[in-house]
């Protein structure tokens, strides 16, 4: 290669970045093998668009200007979750992508829904076009599937015709089997996947997390203003629940509690994310249209409004019968709302006693009255919520994801 004395050449490496050098300051060049693209900058001949060689530069101090990036992994995210508002998968997806864009830009190049080569392709939803893409010969790197649900967990959520249930189940597990590795947000899913024939070593548990810049407590004066706007006095006890309006969320118990405790204000944020496909849609719609006077249904709300509702909560209650890994619990904990739950096996594993567990509606009722009468006990429960927030912080989960992607990318090259 011939350069004029004043030519500035920029070699842009596909993975390693860019460096600049002047011919008259070049000390030594060794030949070898790597792939590069060049940009013409000055008076030098045209070359073919790619060439294989290795450029090793030995230079004196200040002789060559070098700007070189450390090799980055390319992670391509595939997700349609944000097409459906008010459900946890979209929230978990956006939190992960936002965290990686913000804090892992030195290690990763993160793209979304692009038909490109990548070190890792991360499937967040099980769309049929994504399923078909797993059969294409083009390089997608290591295929990682995110398991947010199992076929059985759809019971009580979506209204699926009986004759389709078997087809849906086979499709879901076929999709998961197309993946080279699976990530579960619920550790209880691991055994179910193993029973379905997926090797245990092919599954990794990585929990959800939330952004503390987005989900945080509000000042007391702001809470007082919100109570005034809502028409609720300072000493009125408020119980907040959140999630899709579905049978499995325990919405029936939440409504019954409001009926049995007229002196307590109840608020349920959420709606029908899947419209008429929601199991029990007509019945729950009638309930929402005619709630008890002390029960409010604001519907699907913005994150900003949801943060305000968590701030209003004297107690956050999620009476679900079946859960995956609810983002609402992490959001409420990050906003320092005391948390009461139906005592599912999942919570015993992931929350380790940092909540008030209840077995049924009667225990929930007794606990609400107990906390209304005992501010000290409520304050203790609030401190436990802070423990949840620390355990599922961004800082803790960021390194877990970086290590996971690095390991999977290495396996994908073998």
How should each PLM-predicted stretch be described?
Residues 163-182, 285:
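Membrane-proximal helix-turn-helix segments that form the acceptor-binding/catalytic region
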Residues 227, 233-249, 255-259, 267:
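Conserved donor-binding/catalytic core segment of Leloir-type glycosyltransferases
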Residues 242, 265-282, 299:
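Glycosyltransferase donor-sugar binding loop
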Residues 280-304:
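Nucleotide-activated donor-binding/catalytic signature segment of Leloir-type glycosyltransferases, i.e.
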Residues 300, 308-313:
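Short alpha-helical donor nucleotide-sugar binding micro-motif in glycosyltransferases
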Residues 321:
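Aromatic "clamp/platform" in nucleotide-sugar-dependent glycosyltransferases that forms part
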Residues 338-341:
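Short hydrophobic beta-strand element within catalytic cores of glycosyltransferases
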Residues 353-363, 369-376:
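Conserved acidic donor-binding segment of nucleotide-sugar-dependent glycosyltransferases
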């Amino acid at each position: 290669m011939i350069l004029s004395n004043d030519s500035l050449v920029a070699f842009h490496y596909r993975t390693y970045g860019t460096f600049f050098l002047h011919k008259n300051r070049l000390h030594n060049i060794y030949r070898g093998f790597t792939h590069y693209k060049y940009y013409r900058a000055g008076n030098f001949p045209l070359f073919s668009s790619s060439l294989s060689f290795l450029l090793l530069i030995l230079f004196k101090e200040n002789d060559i200007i070098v700007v070189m990036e450390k090799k980055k992994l390319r992670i391509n995210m595939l997700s349609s979750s944000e097409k459906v508002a008010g459900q946890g998968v979209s929230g978990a997806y956006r939190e992960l992508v936002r965290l990686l864009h913000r804090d892992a830009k030195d290690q990763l190049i993160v793209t979304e829904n692009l038909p490109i080569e990548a070190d890792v392709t991360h499937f967040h939803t099980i769309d049929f076009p994504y399923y078909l893409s797993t059969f294409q010969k083009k390089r997608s790197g290591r295929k990682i599937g995110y398991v947010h649900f199992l076929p059985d967990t759809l019971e009580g959520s979506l209204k699926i015709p009986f004759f389709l249930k078997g087809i849906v189940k086979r499709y879901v597990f076929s999709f998961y089997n197309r993946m080279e590795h699976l990530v579960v947000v619920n550790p209880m899913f691991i055994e179910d996947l193993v029973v379905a024939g997926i090797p245990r070593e092919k599954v990794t548990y990585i929990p959800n997390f939330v952004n503390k810049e987005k989900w945080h407590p509000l000042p007391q004066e702001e809470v007082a203003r919100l109570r005034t706007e809502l028409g609720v006095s300072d000493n009125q006890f408020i119980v907040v629940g959140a999630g899709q309006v579905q049978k499995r969320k325990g919405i029936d118990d939440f409504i019954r509690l409001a009926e049995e405790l007229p002196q307590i204000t109840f608020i349920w944020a959420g709606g029908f994310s899947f419209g008429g496909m929601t199991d029990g849609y007509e019945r729950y719609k009638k309930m929402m249209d005619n709630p008890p006077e002390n029960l409010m249904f604001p519907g699907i709300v913005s994150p900003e409004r949801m943060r305000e509702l968590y701030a209003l909560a004297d107690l956050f209650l999620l009476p679900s019968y079946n859960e995956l890994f609810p983002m609402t619990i992490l959001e409420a904990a990050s906003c320092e709302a005391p948390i009461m739950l139906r005592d599912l096996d999942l919570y015993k594993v992931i929350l380790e006693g940092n909540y008030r567990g209840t077995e049924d509606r009667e225990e929930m009722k007794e606990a609400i009255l107990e906390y209304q009468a005992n501010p000290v006990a409520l304050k203790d429960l609030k401190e436990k919520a802070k423990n949840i927030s620390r355990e599922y912080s961004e800082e803790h989960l960021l390194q877990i994801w970086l290590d996971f992607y690095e390991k999977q990318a290495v396996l994908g090259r073998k």
